[in-house]
Amino acid sequence: MKNLDLAEKVSTKKTYLWKDLKTWKKENGFIKNKNKKKNLHVVAIDYGIKKNILRYFSDFNCKVTVVSCKTVAKDILKLKPNGIFLSNGPGDPAATGKYAIPIIKDLIKNNLPIFGICLGHQILALTL
């Protein structure tokens, strides 16, 4: 995996609003989330995100906008997020970091909460 940027291959090509408001409950299967009010807006940078992570954000009544792994900070900030999520994904964080680290550095300057999982967390660590 060394030097492989696989995130670019699996990332969304277009920005989209996550609209699947169904929640998985082991006992019931998918059920509709009855609380329609969205409290926080999270922008998820897609390095290969799993849909279940997006479902969990919905469970917590977050509005979630998913953007490409190469979306620049200026365009992310135009979405007026309350926080930034750096997703999981395949590949070498150093290779993906070549374009991701400058974006994350620009986002950090705006004092927004930024958090990640797996590859996203590794890229955040490289950024800091």
What residue ranges belong to the model's regions?
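Cysteine-nucleophile active-site neighborhood
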Residues: K78, N82-L128
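RNA-binding accessory domains that recognize and position tRNA/RNA substrates
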Residues: M1-K80, G91-P93, I108
